[in-house]
Amino acid sequence: MYIICTYADITTIRRFNTMKQFMDKDFLLSTDTAKALFHDYAENMPILDYHCHINPKEIAEDRKFENITQVWLGGDHYKWRQMRSNGVDEYYITGGASDREKFQKWAETLTKAIGNPLYHWSHLELQRYFDYHGVLNGDTAEEVWNICNAKLADDSMTVRNIIKKSGVTLICTTDDPVDSLEYHKQIAEDPTFDVQVLPAWRPDKAMNIEKPDYTDYHAKLSEVSGVEVKSFEGLKEALVKRMAFFDSMGCRASDHALEYVMYKPATAEEIEAIFAKRLGGAALTKEEELKFKTAFMTFVGKEYNKLGWAMQLHYGAKRDNNVFRYNQLGPDTGYDCINTYSSSAEMADFLNSMNATDELPKTIIYSLNPIDNAAIGTVLGCFQDSTAVGKIQQGSAWWFNDHKVGMTDQMTSLANLGLLGNFIGMLTDSRSFLSYTRHEYFRRIMCELLGKWVENGEYPADMKTLGGMVRDISYNNAVRYFGFKLDTVEK
């Protein structure tokens, strides 16, 4: 008997003999060194999520989700953007469509997301939390919907159990100075839940003097602090009191969302005059706004140094560009983009102003523009000292950059210009409790990068040293850097 094979048949046979399985155990790992580093060192490390946007109330109340749409699409503007790009009507995104209809539209959109991290994240979450190893698309949406919802109905999939299942030891939420932190307190006092949930200080509303509701915010700050905010000195006093409260609740980090890092110094008298002008209802010039924000950031930075907090600077986003949709849906709904203005010179001046008086805190710098990687890498080296290992850090690839290429580029640039071994690693920056797989995604990409360097002869195949480095970047460095009350994992 003769079997006649066409060229296409032979090509297909060869391809299936060599092609990797879809997102198998060695997903993103192409070398033996990368596989060993991930499976032997990175894979089972705990997770320390030092920056995210999850709601502590949902942890305190141990929320149980009714369906996968609530988990995936309730507030995920990453997914919303792609659904809009696929021509999906807003009714099925943030509108009144049923959860099942919204999930269907997302499944149909996901098919086209080849090369997008959402494709990988979604399938990692399906594998790790729902034991589904198939492919989500429009045709399989009903099957996946039923599988996920059946799992979510089980008590093992409450918010707290998801966190424990993920291997999380500590979470830092994002909190305003006026927040009561009542849910953090409730969690901390619950002996049945041993994951630390700590606040992180986010004082953007106290700084953004140009916003129309700025004076209204000061009324809230005055109430919770017991300090009447009628001057910049009063504002500083109120903030110091709230910082002390946050510190007592375990806070070890601040976070700032900046359009860019500014540095426009002014005298104390000028700042008081600018503050009084704004409280009087007058509009400020751009120069006055920048002077005030410079004074604000310099003040809080020095206070962070006293407290031993780390200062996180997230900059480079131009937000709320679609005014029509902003008026309908509000902020954080998927209408932001990268701001191409480079502020590395001002950033260096800003850091130098605190360093000159020995008051520069530990600082983590994130730019949304990947072009800034090298500039940040060189700024880091200007302000390192012996007070902390890797005192000034470049943050992990952020938002529009937390994909395979973005993470690889960020770590490569950091390695080229600094010490990758001191990097504090990944964070979710997410509003979803299923996003902890992003730590796995990052670790796979990191191990692939290190593995290629080793197998190319660029670094010794010393698995003890490499394994320690992988563990450190995955978890230990962040424990040490922030000073959290956690044990490191050395073996």
Model-predicted regions and their roles:
Residues 20-307, 359-361, 365-377, 381-491:
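Metal-cofactor-binding active-site regions of metalloenzymes
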Residues 311-313:
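C-terminal amphipathic alpha-helical interaction region
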Residues 322:
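Hard-cation-handling environments
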Residues 326-334:
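Short glycine/proline- and charge-enriched loop/turn segments
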Residues 341-347:
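Divalent-cation-assisted or electrostatically stabilized phosphate/pyrophosphate-binding catalytic cores
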Residues 350-356:
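Short, basic/hydrophobic alpha-helical segments
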